[in-house]
Amino acid sequence: GGAPVSEAAFAHGIAAAAEAGRRVNARRAAAGERPYDVTEFDTLTVAAAVVFAEAGVDVAVLECGMGGRWDATSAMKSIRSVAVTGIGLDHTRILGDTLEAIAGEKAAIIKPGRACVLGVGCATPTSVEDVFLEQCRAAGVTPTLVRALDRADVAGEMHPGIAREHAGLPQASFGVTKRPNRLGAPLELSVNTPRSLYAELACLKPGYQAANVACAVALAEAHLGRALAQDALFE
C-alpha cells in the first residue's frame, strides 16, 4: 500500500525467479535444447511478478524494458490494458533502425481484449501512427488517442508535427493551465476524456510529464471502464 518492497520480499522474489529459470533450462537441457540466456531484466520481471502476486495487489503496472514483442513482460498472460507513450531511435541494433520498425515492435503489445492508449509521441510522424493504428485494427481494439490542446505543450516531443484527427476514435486531450514560476514549482494541467474532465492536476518539470499524466489518466480509465474518482488523483 504505497510502500517500497521490503528487502526480504525482494530477495524472495529474486530467489524464486532464479529457481524458475534454473528449472526451465534444466528441462530444455534434458530435451536437448539450447538453454535460454536469462538476463537481469528477465529475472527482475519475474521477481516483480512474484512479489505482486504474493502481496495480492489489485493492479500492477509493468514497464517494457525494450520494445515489446520479445520483452520479458510479454510473458504475462493477464495483461488487460496497455499504453505506448511514444517512440525514439533506441536499441536500434535489436529493434530496427527506423521509427516504423521500432513502432512495430512496440505495437506488438496491442492484442485482442486489451484496452489501449496511444500517447502523443505515437501520433507523429504519420507513418509511425499508421503502424499503431493498423495493429489496433488487426487486434480488434479501439485505442484512446492522447492529444494536446496547444501544440506548445508538446514542444519537447521527439518528433514534432501536427497530429491527425480520427473520427470515431476516443480522445483524451490535455492542456497546461499554469506553468512553473520558480524552481521546484509544479506545472498544472487539465485532462478531458470522453468520461470526465480532470482539472488542476499537477506534476513537476520537465514539461513532457504533462503528456505522461494525460496518458496515465486515460489508461486508468480504460482499465477500469469508468471515470476516475477525482480525489484519488490527488492522493
Residue ranges of model-derived segments:
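Short loop-to-beta-strand entry elements in the cores of soluble alpha/beta enzymes
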Residues: 110-121
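ATP-dependent carboxylate-amine ligase catalytic core
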Residues: 1-77, 89, 93-101, 123-127
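Short, conserved phosphate/pyrophosphate- and ester-handling motifs at nucleotide-, phospho-/glycolipid
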Residues: 212
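Membrane-proximal helix-turn-helix segments that form the acceptor-binding/catalytic region
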Residues: 103-111
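Alpha-helical scaffold segments in soluble metabolic enzymes
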Residues: 12, 16, 47, 51, ...
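Gly/charged, well-structured mid-domain segments that form the phosphate/adenylate-handling core
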Residues: 181-182, 195, 205-207, 215-235
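A short glycine-threonine-serine/GTX helix/turn-capping micro-motif
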Residues: 98, 201-207
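Extended acidic/charged loop-beta regions that coordinate divalent cations
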Residues: 47-94, 129-199
